[in-house]
């Protein structure tokens, strides 16, 4: 999340500087992963590198460039031949469908709701698995929502912000206000956050946290206040006790509201737009899987089970999750399945994209691609007229007041932005005819990187050129400026 962050104060708050940047951390990590893989398997090249990316990156202007940045880092590694960036929920779906076939001996044919709650983002994605061509399985994204914005120094309202807020709450509870605020946000504080995460992971692994909550419930905070974890967390030379009431209070303040909101949205959209009632069992062709490191946290699982009405006899996780480790490794194992060709992704548009132009004195949005429609990779989709023919635009005029990205939910969720002056001039200069006439389209590459297509139109001959001029949009913020309401 921080790799695309333009607010320097947010980056510095997490102890990065001009040398040790989030991008540097990503480059170092990916280089080390490739090096270790080659050393383990005795290879000197990686034919196909599949990297998972949060689907929620598509839902915010500031993170739209994330996939291009990750792809470029991977392409800079000399021994990597091909790179593919895939949504993490799609990768998890591949692994769970594979698990289902191993457990039942039958291919999975249906829908999987992936709730990916990791350290930095929350992704809820409804995917469809079907037998595809060449005996491989195809995975299609049906619906997606989530939370992942960097706001108030919080990353994605997920595991990281929970750990940070919990430790800050513990410190404020025990230390004088001035002393507490001086400690919070320091390198010592973040070392304490890491220690706290280890304690909670160990408590869940050993069953201590689950057993205690199962016995006492999560509602009586007075009783839970007297019950503490065996280990204390050290920070700034102090030992801080962690009560079960602390775990619940911070969870209710930070996680529960946004998790509830996003689950409710997914339930509504799945039923309205796809006829899938995710709150009911449907003969085994609907599965629900909670994944990501934070997905092993008891309070997260309890909230999810309550929302979807899970019972002891429920089969919506049966056959796809064999043990709790599956929740953490589903994405990485799914990447291996896609890299090896066992699963293929059915290409769907990650968002709708269009331009708003003044037509007869009124602004009108004309879309080239619509959210989640099936598309062909690298196939351009143009603005068309009422007859479905490619529409001729004049790039010498004020041809695009705004660009628009949305998710089919109306203008309330649209991201509106303007092309910067230099970029509009660059596009116009790509058209060589005097009238600057052309058709305008977009495509998505293998890693969902947006490309703009311009095909010249000869007004005298009345025909389009045989090929397009293509301009890839790597970093959105370099060529576009977000319109704030």
Give names to the regions the model predicted.
Residues 1-3, 100-142, 335, 436-456:
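Gly/Thr-rich phosphate-binding beta-strand-loop-beta motif of the actin/hexokinase/Hsp70
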Residues 77-91, 304-334:
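Conserved phosphate-binding/catalytic loops in two-lobed NTP-binding clefts
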Residues 49-66, 280-307, 323-328:
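Glycine-rich phosphate-binding loops at beta-strand->alpha-helix junctions
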Residues 2, 77, 151-305:
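Gly/charged contiguous loops adjacent to phosphate- or pyrophosphate-bearing nucleotide/cofactor binding elements
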Residues 1-12, 134, 142-160, 165-174, ...:
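Early-domain small/polar-rich strand-loop-helix modules and first-structured segments
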Residues 313-430:
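Acidic, glycine/GT-rich loop-and beta-edge segments that sit at the periphery of enzyme/chaperone cores
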Residues 83-115, 329-344:
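Conserved phosphate-binding catalytic cores of ATP/NTP-utilizing and phosphoryl-transfer enzymes
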Residues 1-77, 162-214, 476, 480-485:
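Phosphate-binding loop and its immediate beta->loop->alpha context
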């Amino acid at each position: 999340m921080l790799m695309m962050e333009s607010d320097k104060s947010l980056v510095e708050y997490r102890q990065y500087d001009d040398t040790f940047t989030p991008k540097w951390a990503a480059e170092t990590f990916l280089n080390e992963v490739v090096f270790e893989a080659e050393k383990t398997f005795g290879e000197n090249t990686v034919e196909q590198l599949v990297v998972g990316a949060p689907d929620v990156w598509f839902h915010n202007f500031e993170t739209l460039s994330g996939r291009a940045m990750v792809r470029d880092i991977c392409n800079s590694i000399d021994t990597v031949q091909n790179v593919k960036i895939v949504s993490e929920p799609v990768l998890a779906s591949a692994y769970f469908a594979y698990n289902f076939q191993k457990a039942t001996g039958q291919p999975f044919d249906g829908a999987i709701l992936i709730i990916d709650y990791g350290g930095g983002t929350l992704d809820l994605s409804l995917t469809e698995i079907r037998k595809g061509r060449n005996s491989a399985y195809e995975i299609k994204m049906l619906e997606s929502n989530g939370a992942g914005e960097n706001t108030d120094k919080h990353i994605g309202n997920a595991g990281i912000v929970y750990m940070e807020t919990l430790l800050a709450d513990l410190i404020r509870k025990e230390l004088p206000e001035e002393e507490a605020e001086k400690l919070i946000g320091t390198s010592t504080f973040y070392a304490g956050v890491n220690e706290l995460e280890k304690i909670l992971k160990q408590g869940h692994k050993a069953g201590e946290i689950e057993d205690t909550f199962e016995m006492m419930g999560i509602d009586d905070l007075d009783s839970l206040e007297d019950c503490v974890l065996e280990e204390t967390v050290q920070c700034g030379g102090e030992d801080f006790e962690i009560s079960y009431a602390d775990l619940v209070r911070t969870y209710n303040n930070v996680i529960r509201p946004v998790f509830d909101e996003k689950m409710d949205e997914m339930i509504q959209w799945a039923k309205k737009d796809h006829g899938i009632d995710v709150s009911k069992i449907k003969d085994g062709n609907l599965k629900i899987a909670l994944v990501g490191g934070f997905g092993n946290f008891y309070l997260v699982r309890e909230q999810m089970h309550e929302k979807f009405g899970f019972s002891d006899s429920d089969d919506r996780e049966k056959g796809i999750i064999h043990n709790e480790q599956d929740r953490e490794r589903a994405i990485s194992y799914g990447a291996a399945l896609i890299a090896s060709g066992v699963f293929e992704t059915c290409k769907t548009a990650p968002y709708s994209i269009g331009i708003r132009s003044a037509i007869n004195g009124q602004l009108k949005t004309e879309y080239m691609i619509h959210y989640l429609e099936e598309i062909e990779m690298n196939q351009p989709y143009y603005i068309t007229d009422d007859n479905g023919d490619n529409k001729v635009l004049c790039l010498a005029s004020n041809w695009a007041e705004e660009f628009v990205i949305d998710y089919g939910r109306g203008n309330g969720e649209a991201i509106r932005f303007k092309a910067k002056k230099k970029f509009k001039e660059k596009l116009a200069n790509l058209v060589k005819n005097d009238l600057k006439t052309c058709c305008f389209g977009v495509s998505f590459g293998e890693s969902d990187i947006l490309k703009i297509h311009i095909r010249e139109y000869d007004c005298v001959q009345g025909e389009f050129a045989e090929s397009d001029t293509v301009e890839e949009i790597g970093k959105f913020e370099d060529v576009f400026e977000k319109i704030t309401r």
